[in-house]
Amino acid sequence: MGHEDAVYLAKLAEQAERYEEMVENMKIVASEDRDLTVEERNLLSVAYKNVIGARRASWRIVTSIEQKEESKGNSSQVTLIKEYRQKIENELAKICDDILEVLDQHLIPSAKSGESKVFYHKIKGDYHRYLAEFAIGDRRKDSADKSLEAYKAATEVAQTELPPTHPIRLGLALNFSVFYYEILNAPDQACHLAKQAFDDAIAELDTLSEESYKDSTLIMQLLRDNLTLWTSSEAETPARLMPLLRRRPLLRLPSRRRRAQG
């Protein structure tokens, strides 16, 4: 199959919500060992995100049910649920291993621009994080270590190659902070990372281009939402973090929209 046909079929599969087929078509594009266009990168990301997202949602639901049945002492149901959860985890692992192989063998070695390098290392960090969400013992530690390494590699490039308001840099900070909070159980580091990204972007908000304004401000609001959630209890929050939510006003999105429309 040719390059253009693979891209077209990936778009068609997206419209039809047949994301497994979208993945297969974008793997053909990714295997060409060249730096993908922005559109191609996004198609690849959307394809895998939908495939993995459905399984992650299923895993959370089944895990919640398992915990409820365990609390009730329903051992026979718990046995069935554990087997079913394992099936979902096997699917999750297969998807993660698949995209990580594509990244390591094709996309990361072929990345030329700083934007591409950040994008791919961020995705690598994301999918190792997804593995760490359900893995246990040494496997969890290995996935967490690899996720941390990938996020750090992405951050190193982002800080020199991308402005603080760039949506990919902001998205990296968002996901990296979630990694600290959920995987490493390090809320202090999570808050500091998210706060720094938010503050750096706020300082340069007026220089943000119109085409990326919507994406960037949305991610900034997600950073703000996480900070609000993570610092919601003053009794549990280090005192040095509490001024954060009192200092910064909410983003004034409507005024910028009026200027853009005018």
UniProtKB/Swiss-Prot annotation:
Instruction: Return the Gene3D superfamilies for the record.
Output: 14-3-3 domain
Pfam families with a match to the protein in the record:
14-3-3
Question: What highest taxon heads this organism's lineage?
Answer: Eukaryota
InterPro entries the record matches: 14-3-3, 14-3-3_CS, 14-3-3_dom_sf, 14-3-3_domain
Which CDD domains does this one have? 14-3-3_fungi (cd11309)
Q: Which family does it belong to?
A: Belongs to the 14-3-3 family.
Q: What is this protein called?
A: 14-3-3 protein homolog
Organism name: Trichoderma harzianum (Hypocrea lixii)
